[in-house]
Amino acid sequence: MFGNFFLRSMSRQILIVPDKFKGTLTAAEAAEAIASGWAAAWPGDELEQLPMSDGGDGFGEVMAASLGIGERLFPGADAAGREREIPCWLNAECNQAVVETAQSNGLALLPSGRFHPFELDTFGVGQLLIQLGQAGVKTCIAGIGGSATNDAGFGMARALGWRFFDEDGQEIQQWIQLDKLA
């Protein structure tokens, strides 16, 4: 009896920290919806919203909002090698970028039924990192969730200029051949 009285008569500080609700709400939209419902039920409470990310889809937007930085588009390739514009978030003051690799090699970017893991790679992520370096970026904060790839960064390393060879000195062209790495 007294517990409910004190809960309703005292103002509380509430921190709302959601991730996205995949396919329905971004983390920011989820935080706003939760805050709206909470405020309707307990109008005296002090609410603070802090949308979060697990490093996958939505990571860039959450970090950009937190850091107060702007978006810039870069040409690049998705996990299947198709060209697209890839958003990154840049802080020119400290030569820093926020990279959401799901925007380059994300599972959500693939058409339905197109998930063939042996044909997908992170080459586009490497291309993006090269462009960021050319733009003066010195530090990257990367979210690497939501990926359609499992190439252990092989494609990214190749885009950055690394070469891999088998015991016969033949260059390895696909990550699935890494078991032959010398």
Report the location of each language-model feature:
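Alpha/propeptide regions of enzymes that mature by internal proteolysis
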Residues: 28, 32-51, 58-59, 133, ...
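N-terminal amphipathic/basic-hydrophobic helices that include classical n-h-c signal peptides
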Residues: 1-9
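Glycine-rich nucleotide/cofactor/substrate-binding loop typically near the N-terminus or early
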Residues: 36-111
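PLP-dependent amino-acid enzyme catalytic core
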Residues: 45, 51, 96-99, 111, ...
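Glycine/threonine-rich beta-strand-loop-alpha-helix active-site module
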Residues: 120-123, 127-143, 148-182
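Gly/Ser/Thr-rich loops at beta-strand to alpha-helix junctions
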Residues: 20-24, 28, 53-55, 144-152
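Extreme N-terminal starter segment of soluble prokaryotic enzymes
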Residues: 10-15
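General beta-strand structural signal in soluble alpha/beta enzymes
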Residues: 16, 48-51, 99-101, 140-142, ...
